[in-house]
Amino acid sequence: MEALGPGPPASLFQPPRRPGLGTVGKPIRLLANHFQVQIPKIDVYHYDVDIKPEKRPRRVNREVVDTMVRHFKMQIFGDRQPGYDGKRNMYTAHPLPIGRDRIDMEVTLPGEGKDQTFKVSVQWVSVVSLQLLLEALAGHLNEVPDDSVQALDVITRHLPSMRYTPVGRSFFSPPEGYYHPLGGGREVWFGFHQSVRPAMWNMMLNIDVSATAFYRAQPIIEFMCEVLDIQNINEQTKPLTDSQRVKFTKEIRGLKVEVTHCGQMKRKYRVCNVTRRPASHQTFPLQLENGQAMECTVAQYFKQKYSLQLKHPHLPCLQVGQEQKHTYLPLEVCNIVAGQRCIKKLTDNQTSTMIKATARSAPDRQEEISRLVKSNSMVGGPDPYLKEFGIVVHNEMTELTGRVLPAPMLQYGGRNKTVATPSQGVWDMRGKQFYAGIEIKVWAVACFAPQKQCREDLLKSFTDQLRKISKDAGMPIQGQPCFCKYAQGADSVEPMFKHLKMTYVGLQLIVVILPGKTPVYAEVKRVGDTLLGMATQCVQVKNVVKTSPQTLSNLCLKMNAKLGGINNVLVPHQRPSVFQQPVIFLGADVTHPPAGDGKKPSIAAVVGSMDGHPSRYCATVRVQTSRQEITQELLYSQEVVQDLTSMARELLIQFYKSTRFKPTRIIYYRGGVSEGQMKQVAWPELIAIRKACISLEEDYRPGITYIVVQKRHHTRLFCADKMERVGKSGNVPAGTTVDSTVTHPSEFDFYLCSHAGIQGTSRPSHYQVLWDDNCFTADELQLLTYQLCHTYVRCTRSVSIPAPAYYARLVAFRARYHLVDKDHDSAEGSHVSGQSNGRDPQALAKAVQIHHDTQHTMYFA
């Protein structure tokens, strides 16, 4: 086993090679949305492009380079069609006649009003060999050369980048023939994702249909009405109220608008604020011809200068450009500029509308992707840039053989110790009792829904049914609740819970009934998890008024886990051999605040298994430096779990206390890392785990296996045989595994679709092994991973990622609620705004610190 020293920098970090292919499971014929790319054995020439003035949007840079190639055709470019990435990289199939010299050119673009001149210099960088890439794909080289993959990526994206609106790795075009409004001035645009990926023997182009939210190009007045729910602008005869103005400002700040009062000159501006005063009162210093300045209102100015009598002088103005420049525009002369993507978090309603508009059954998605690729609008078609480099993209999906892994059996308890066998990723608890059920003797009910919504008789009926189901499940709730009262508002949570803790000795659980979305939830979890250390179970009032055995049974799953029970365990004899010695499973995740929320910190969570099943887990959580303090070097460190040494150490100590064993193996599932950052994140984290071990005992060196779990990718798998499709949505069966054809040419990775798809097309999780002291075979690791997907306590189904990785996400998400500052925040919806309102790092750290009574429980279940 290798010792991890500070060792090589991340750039030299070599992940383990694939230990062979898996063989377990029933073969299944599949199609993947990867399209084979034929590349010639040629050299490609890489040039650096420097455009002044700098910091122009990529779209402008592309126009500049496009114009330059046409304009300097005779002298320099000839018939070459360079591929260009919109920043600094340009590739040609034949060298330019400039040798290694730098060449400077001037390019003029027709601008709004006046032409714009750019200075462009082009300089040779290197020769990129596609021959080397082909050798790597055939498995003859240790590493796939990044520079050739990058060159291919730029060349294949060149044409779509000119034709469509690029967003990340996807391309979108304005809606034609469909309209999916999301409300709040937003709408759905459909497009496609495209990325070049090295695979076994071939380069592949991964193509998927995608959708995202854009702002609708419309007059600002209409936008404002949508945001503020104003039915008819003519009914808005008064100025906006403060709360209306704040809401409107939040939505429009940062957006680009264009003016309509100057004829063809549609100048564009970025909004920085909304004025407090209406246009009839908002003044600015108007420069007179005699050099003096006089205060003039915006409404007056528009009347004098443009003979424009404002229709809505009582509405505010947009302040645009730089704050200090005081440029004001009345709402009625502005439109939203087309093609702006919405980066702010969607509301819950918008999200659900978006899902309804975009969810496609697997066969429909397969059909849509195939149509897209064959329609020539994208790849395969007459793309002069691909032709220039001799690149051919096949237009048929890649066929491959996967395997459907056998599902593990699950052991239940009670008198008859039943075993459940999942079918299609699902099993049920009927006639089964928990492996270890907790007896609940002292419990309380707090109802935050109003009495008229949730009458006492309904409450009583709910608690009676809950007791019946809990008894059937082997988690008997003995007797009526010791306390059952109505309450109102988040402010009453803390005093009530304190009273309960003082009054009822041995109180095990508080069941809290919530009236829909409410700040009460965040407060219940803050008080229960961090302040008093009490187990709480929230229930939506709709589930109390109309109960179903399924809902009650699901509540019992969560309650039993929170109170230290064990719902079920993997039947021991079928587990992989890694269980023959003490092993700890760690799950880790770093979650960032939604875009546009610079004030909030990132949260790192690490959980660890605490028994041999593994079923019980403990959590550790930390607040990390927030996004605005980022320089390029720090960009990766922000993705790294910064305090991992102390977190891993805590979990190892706790494992020892729980089991009296020291783990000889550590299996670490890491969620939330993007592909480009994997190696930079893995290296410091591996060292941190090693340090944690050595800090416990100088020669304590358990074998570490480090696996990145990714769900945010665009690989989709489809059944080649219609008869094998499963369920209404026609997805691949749960347990479908792929480790060849579309996977990495030499590294240890695989796709596993461990869950049964319910809505839309299943997204297989992608697993990449970045370190493996434990020398897993492909079969062992794939089976282990699949079995861990069956151990998630919240439901009786196999989930899409292993339980430890899932729990780490839950812990981080719960910490967001702990950070909600109830005096400043509306914890509205799921986008909890855990404002750090100037709270210092110590205060933030304290806010997520779990109470010692709760610390070693599964409070996050």
From Swiss-Prot:
Post-translational modification (record): Ubiquitinated on surface-exposed lysines by a SCF-like E3 ubiquitin-protein ligase complex containing ZSWIM8 during target-directed microRNA degradation (TDMD), a process that mediates degradation of microRNAs (miRNAs). Ubiquitination by the SCF-like E3 ubiquitin-protein ligase complex containing ZSWIM8 leads to its subsequent degradation, thereby exposing miRNAs for degradation. ZSWIM8 recognizes and binds AGO4 when it is engaged with a TDMD target.
Main localization category: cytoplasm
GO biological process, one term: miRNA metabolic process
Keyword terms: Cytoplasm, Ribonucleoprotein, RNA-binding, RNA-mediated gene silencing, Translation regulation, Ubl conjugation
PROSITE patterns: PAZ (PS50821), PIWI (PS50822)
Record-annotated PAZ domain positions: 219-338
General function of this protein: Required for RNA-mediated gene silencing (RNAi). Binds to short RNAs such as microRNAs (miRNAs) and represses the translation of mRNAs which are complementary to them. Lacks endonuclease activity and does not appear to cleave target mRNAs.
Family recorded in the similarity comment: Belongs to the argonaute family. Ago subfamily.
Subunit structure: Interacts with EIF4B, IMP8, PRMT5, TNRC6A and TNRC6B. Interacts with ZFP36.
Name the record gives this protein: Protein argonaute-4
Gene it is expressed from: Ago4
